[in-house]
């Protein structure tokens, strides 16, 4: 297996070998010194040279004065050299270098074990993590307070000094000018002069100008050399040549233009993976386009099939609705025909009775006319007008020729003609549906969607018949009437907060009923008009017919004219 030094390049500059330190020298000397006996066999042995102390320090079991490395020896020169010590594993303890100059009670982290948390160490069980007691807290607090006081006293800038205790001095007067004062003594009390702590300073401190800065570090440069022609050519930068502007009209050679371009300085190499990548992208795009086209075509077919099925369902529903409507019309027609037969039978009997008894017929006509007149007076103008309109509507061409249709319906040829007409109608409808399907198949997608949307918007009556009419679902603000938001009904409510409605619920309905309901004043005018029209004889000026039609004045007609086929 090759080492890492074989893989590294050779050094460019030779490096001198490291100086052998004192620790290495001592270790070598300790390895070579075998004259020190083992522990427990040093009773008669005494260290005689400094080589005997190279294994550590002094020997405590030998009770003589020992000076390892001449430390503490009388007459020796003091030194700041650190004494080498060994740890429990026998290796040199270099933590003394970090703890040099610090107090003895200061904890300095000097090993890798200090970086490991206490809970993750091997000896975690031996380390006490209990909360300190009151005595330890008190001693720590006192030490901290003393340190603060010492620091504050050192940083006192006011210049005031602490008050000192007064001093008492015994003063004995000397004999002067022939007086005897040796016996007189005084006790003098010496105190400091009180000083105002807010007094401004008496002296002005001026800043001492700083020393001149050290001279800058010298920059070592190689001696100037003369440029060669090759250097000048390498450092030559061609002037800029524009490929778009030439305002002066200079003629620039191609080599200068290419030199100014700068694109020929590097060889451009195009990786062939770009071409492969583009080809793969194009192939994937083509595949995806084909898949999307097939999916779109399939979705279009499914949509067309669903639309066709929906149209078939609607067409079937419409056909059923038409059939039900035709069945209902036929049943109604049959009922009407039966009613007509009954009416005709009753009219024949009435005519026979009238022909047998003319007097009774005249009295019957008078009573009927009187009853009709009284009924017309009791009716409102609105009812009379609606009655007239309904009567005019009932006089349709179909009712005029009811006798002809009844006679035709009873013939077998009419049934065949009706069935042929129905088959023709169904055939035309199927033809129209086939033509419509053909047009839809030839239409494009957009036109087909428009056509389907147009056909879906059927008439509301047809949608109701098909059961496809659905109320429009409103959303947003369209659900509420905006006129309700701008109303303030406090005045109309009488300032009553509990009354939420300002108007009655059926107020509009009462107004509508009052509009379309005839009043008592209008009834009298309408009755007078009806009486005047009934009593007026506007055709008397033309003369009176001498002979009327047979059975014409038997009774008043109250419905449409019905013709009766003569029985052969």
Curated annotation (Swiss-Prot):
PANTHER family: NUCLEAR PROTEIN SKIP-RELATED. GO terms for cellular component: post-mRNA release spliceosomal complex; Prp19 complex. One of its GO terms (molecular function) is molecular adaptor activity. It is found in: Nucleus. Belongs to the SNW family. Keywords: mRNA processing, mRNA splicing, Nucleus, Spliceosome. The keyword Nucleus applies. The lineage of its organism: Eukaryota, Fungi, Dikarya, Ascomycota, Saccharomycotina. It holds the Pfam family SKIP_SNW. Associated with the spliceosome. Disulfide bonds: none annotated. This is Pre-mRNA-processing protein 45. GO terms for biological process: mRNA splicing, via spliceosome.
